[in-house]
Amino acid sequence: MQATNPIWAEVQQSLQKTLSKPSFETWIRPAKFNCFENGLLTLIAPNTFSSDWLRKNYCETIEKAAKEICGHDVKVVFKSETNTSSDLSNEDKANEKNVHHKTRSFSSNNQNNSSKNQFKNPNGLNLRYVFKRFVVGPNSRLAHAAALAVAESPGREFNPLFICGGVGLGKTHLMQAIGHYRVEIDPEAKVKYVSTETFTNDVISGIRRDGMTAIRDKYRNVDLILIDDIQFLEGKEYTQEEFFHTFNALHESGSQIVIASDRPPNQLSGIQERLISRFSMGMTADIQPPDLETRTAILQKKAEQERMSLPRDLIQFIAGRFTSNIRELEGAFTRAVAFASITGLPMTVQSIAPMLDPNSVGVVVTPKQVINKVSDFFKVSTDELISSSRRKPVSQARQIGMYLMRHGTDLSLPRIGDEFGGKDHTTVMYAIEQVEKKLSIDPNIASQVQKIRDLLQIDSRKNL
């Protein structure tokens, strides 16, 4: 296989001008030249999935560009690196209109039109979650390619698209990027992003108010539905029943369904087998934790987006320290920048490292500091915090306060109980266990705890 070829290089340059950047970078750039003989251009795709998608959606576009450059008809065939024989024939090419080629006529001005689409912002699409902000690595390449394929040609081959992976790896980002890209291509598209919790609450509300007809219209009258955290359907029998019929209605109408979960369909528990079967009938793409190179690239891209300048050794330190997920990685970046900005300390590994300790407050603080900071953060009075109130906002703040006092001071459990109005040491132990349990499953709690830790760090260092 030749490393380069002037004909293919010119074709790529031509396509780069006519295709969107995500499409070009995902499908065209990775394709390698194999040979060009007797008007037959053979290209090598990274895998069978890519070669199939190129053949069905870009073959005609590539042939047209090659003809303009060569001055005669050119036929294109695709092979994959994992399969050296030619992939599927081109016999269906004439019947498969190139959806992507048709939709490229939409200019960037459609961004203004799409903002008028009632299904965009009202349905929770975060403007930051777009394809151009997603860093693709070996851990996410297949999921990214599948997401882009669905965004370009919804309701066709990968329906449903089931994206799975651990917490904070980019599932929600990819899902919402599909929605944004689809609306950019087709401003009239009805796109809806919803969490499973919201869907469940809507079903419950519909039952109570005898309004299920309106709920069904809300979820079934869409072109593209993006459903996050489907694992939370576990044990909810009536909601599962309603979702089963919603899924069927959408699928039968040709609407695209995209589902995200923290595990693949065959590992979901407490969910009806008929739903599991439907989740598995399309394509399942998983996202793994990013490797060091990808984590470094993510931090560099975030620094560029935020117009921040971080020393390379600090970026490498953060990338090497936070390995489990992207949310944690970006959170560390944000804390480092905020800490340096507020304290005036230099952006060095030595000054930032204590702040990034994920297991402790990092400096010794007083019980009064913890109580005051927790009180300020949750907007509850210190009297309420140390009272016996069982109101959820107060009890949750109290539990977090006990957890932080345990990890930020040298007080024993009974002493911590005394600081919180004379609580028994078993109450303190229970509170700490509850917070530790929630830290691994509730991103909101984890974020709250980390923010208070950071505030305690900053206050303590100001007093040094």
Curated annotation (Swiss-Prot):
Residues 1-79 are annotated as: Domain I, interacts with DnaA modulators. Residues 341-464 are annotated as: Domain IV, binds dsDNA. Disulfide bonds: none annotated. Residues 79-123 are annotated as: Domain II. One of its GO terms (cellular component) is plasma membrane. It is found in: Cytoplasm. Residues 124-340 are annotated as: Domain III, AAA+ region. ATP binds at G168, G170, K171, T172. Signal peptide: none annotated. Residues 84-121 are annotated as: Disordered. GO terms for molecular function: ATP binding; ATP hydrolysis activity; DNA replication origin binding; lipid binding. GO terms for biological process: DNA replication initiation; regulation of DNA replication. Keywords: ATP-binding, Cytoplasm, DNA replication, DNA-binding, Lipid-binding, Nucleotide-binding. Oligomerizes as a right-handed, spiral filament on DNA at oriC. Domain I is involved in oligomerization and binding regulators, domain II is flexibile and of varying length in different bacteria, domain III forms the AAA+ region, while domain IV binds dsDNA. PANTHER family: CHROMOSOMAL REPLICATION INITIATOR PROTEIN DNAA. NCBIfam families: DnaA. Belongs to the DnaA family. This is Chromosomal replication initiator protein DnaA. It comes from Prochlorococcus marinus (strain AS9601). The gene is dnaA.
